[in-house]
Design a protein with these regions (language model features):
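A contiguous pocket-lining binding segment that forms or flanks enzyme active sites
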Residues: 205-207, 215-217, 221, 225-241
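Beta-strand elements within well-structured catalytic alpha/beta cores of enzymes
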Residues: 71-78, 183, 214-224
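Flexible, D/E/H-enriched segments
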Residues: 1-70, 90-199, 211, 231-315
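Active-site microenvironments of hydrolase-like enzyme catalytic domains
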Residues: 73, 77-98, 225-226
């Protein structure tokens, strides 16, 4: 049956911690980059307001997912040199075929013993993952396949999956009761997949899911504009973010296909994670996104966005 729900959100680390602690990550991520005047206006009171909006937005996504009650959730994120690295392998597309993925809730640069102890497990739909992997290869998408959900080059080996999954999975499904299919895109390291390739990947996934007798949802996480530790660290390209969100709302896939064709510093760094949203947009086809919220937050170093695609709402 057709994919019945799409979800997307940002996964910048400060999205998941109290605003009182945002300064730690903010100072790490901006390095020596001069900051915009707007950053100084983000007082603790302002940051608390952003944090409240973030939690309300997650609540909307949680409610949509709980109401749909999918049999499986396809989760699309990117690798940050955690699962893969340039000395081993950096695939454009990778899929997890293991029985379960594990992770911990703490951020790798925070020495938080309590959070480090909070290991969680996501059960994976191995049969659906294998079906999608085989089908995508037949549709000329060359996938890397893995059965080991462990980080490679950042932090201790037992941290499990990268933070694109470990931070978002418990927020979306607190009971971790929906079998998942885990899919990685390369969004940081050249050569990068084009926007068209990402949209086509989503369309191919949707075509394969249509042949299944399962209720399936798809979730993309990352972005929007940000450049941690890069030359634009702390700066947010709000016009770009709003343009992308408007195109998603309009289901304007033709416009989105050209997104990364021009060479721009803005497209480098974390902004490339918009590719994960494009996979969802491709999977949802003519269904436009409902934009739940958007915030250009310098102390999160990110354009923070939340959206969902509900075909039933579009009828």
């Amino acid at each position: 049956m057709p994919i019945g729900l799409g979800l997307a959100c940002s996964h910048a680390p400060n999205v998941f911690i109290p605003p009182e602690h945002w300064d730690v990550r903010y100072k790490q991520a901006i390095a020596d980059v001069p900051q915009p005047l707007a950053a100084a206006r983000e007082t603790l009171e302002v940051r608390r307001g952003y944090a409240a909006r973030i939690e309300r937005a997650f609540e909307v996504l949680r409610d949509k997912l709980a109401a749909y009650k999918p049999d499986a959730l396809i989760m699309v994120t990117d690798d940050h040199n955690e699962m893969y690295d340039e000395n081993l392998c950096q695939p454009s597309i990778a899929m997890f075929l293991g029985e379960r993925g594990t992770g911990i809730l703490s951020l790798r640069y925070n020495d938080d013993a309590e959070q480090n102890a909070k290991r969680f497990t996501v059960t994976c739909d191995q049969e659906l993952a294998a079906y999608l992997a085989n089908g995508l290869v037949q549709m000329e998408f060359d996938l890397a396949l893995t059965r080991t959900p462990e980080t490679r080059s950042l932090g201790p080996e037992d941290r499990g999956m990268g933070h694109g999954f470990t931070r978002t999975a418990p927020k979306l499904m607190p009971d971790l009761d929906i079998p998942a299919v885990l899919l990685w895109l390369n969004c940081y390291f050249e050569p990068l997949p084009t926007a068209k390739r990402c949209i086509d990947l989503g369309r191919a996934i949707a075509e394969l899911c249509r042949k299944r007798d399962q209720k399936i949802a798809i979730f993309g996480t990352g972005g929007l504009s940000h450049d941690p530790r890069g030359p634009r660290g702390g700066w947010v390209d709000e016009p770009l973010d709003r343009s992308v969100l408007q195109a998603l709302a309009n289901a304007d896939l033709d416009r989105l296909r050209s997104l990364f064709l021009l060479n721009s510093d803005t497209y480098h760094g974390g902004t490339g994670e918009i590719r994960n949203w494009l996979v969802v947009a491709g999977a949802m086809g003519d269904c436009g996104a409902t934009i739940v919220d958007y915030m250009a937050v310098h102390h999160i170093i990110t354009g923070v966005g939340f959206a969902y695609w509900d075909p039933a709402k579009s009828i």
